[in-house]
Amino acid sequence: MSERKRIYLCLAHMSEDGMEQKYVKEAFDTNWVVPLGPNVNGFEKDLEEFVGQNKRVVALSAGTAAVHLALLNCGVGPGDEVLVQSFTFCASSHPITYLGATPVFID
């Protein structure tokens, strides 16, 4: 019987130049181990330049924060209804209720 080839689902690895350890150490040394700070600011700036076309970039700490920001940007507010899949985690509907809107669960 031949041995099966292992398929890695996570491609996390150190880059060729190994700068990851430098950035992690820098974050701890400067006490910026939070979802903001100079490294995040630099990432946002670099990504804006990469995307171009006068697009703005915001790095967020969680998917829930991203949904919340997207709903704000769409103008969702009190009295609105927002469709949400019913087979989901509560974090999908919480940003809707934060804004005073009503989640409507659908399949």
For the regions a language model picked out, list residue spans one by one.
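Conserved PLP-binding active-site segment in aminotransferase class I/II-type PLP enzymes
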Residues: 1-73, 77, 99
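PLP-dependent aminotransferase-like
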Residues: 72, 76-107
